[in-house]
Amino acid sequence: GVARLVQISAIGANEGSESVYAQTKAQGEKAIQDAFPGAVILRPSVIFGPEDDFFNRFAGMTRFSPVLPVVGAETRFQPVYVDDVAQAAEMGATGVAPSGIYELGGPDVNTFRELMQQMLKVIRRRRLIMNIPFGLAAAMAWGFELVQTLSLGLIPPQITRDQVRSLRVDNVVSGKARGFADLGIRPVAMEVVMPDYLWRFRPAGQYEAIKESASRLRPQR
């Protein structure tokens, strides 16, 4: 049989949520706990790292767009480094972590807008961050979903209505939850890791630092 079980869920898992995503995460947790009471359940916030689908996605948009559209610019997140989540999962799989639910967030809490500002600073680009109101975003998402249906799934939506619902709620560790401190893990801050993998989105890529140094050496007129 299975000696230990670790489930990766998500912060915000709640059967009473308006978001289907949050509902299904909670339902999955309940099913796991019913079948395997000794399971370790991890609820990370937005995960960042070399192959993440968050910062990489938005950084990629800056290559061809002067505007960076975001939904829920003031919604708060607590991004967590993928290696820290992996370490927590390893502790659960090896029996070091006691059974139960752990909410995993990084050391910093930022709004969506602030996260985009930090990302732009790392990739050395200036873009207008445009907040899209939830009502307009929901209407746009409906259109994207319609296109997906008409294309028989060949054209995926840029955003879904359920994602818009999720973005209405802060994605941060709750005050009473067990987390990294209970596991003895000190989470890594975003600014330590982001330059290591987002440099390729800089205007001159890996040569951006050389370009900046050269510009400082030019004689002033």
For the regions a language model picked out, list residue spans one by one:
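Flexible, glycine-rich beta-alpha linker
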Residues: 17-20, 40-61, 76, 110-111
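Conserved sequence/active-site signature of Rossmann-fold short-chain dehydrogenase/reductase
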Residues: 13, 47-49, 85
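Substrate-positioning beta->alpha
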Residues: 23, 53-54, 72-94, 100-103, ...
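Conserved Rossmann-fold NAD(P)-dependent oxidoreductase catalytic core, especially the SDR/UDP-sugar
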Residues: 1-35, 39-45
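Substrate-binding strand-loop-helix patch
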Residues: 76-83, 102-122, 131-142, 186-188
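A hydrophobic C-terminal alpha-helical subdomain
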Residues: 135-221
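A short C-terminal helix-loop "cap" of Rossmann-like NAD(P)-dependent dehydrogenase/epimerase domains
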Residues: 59-72
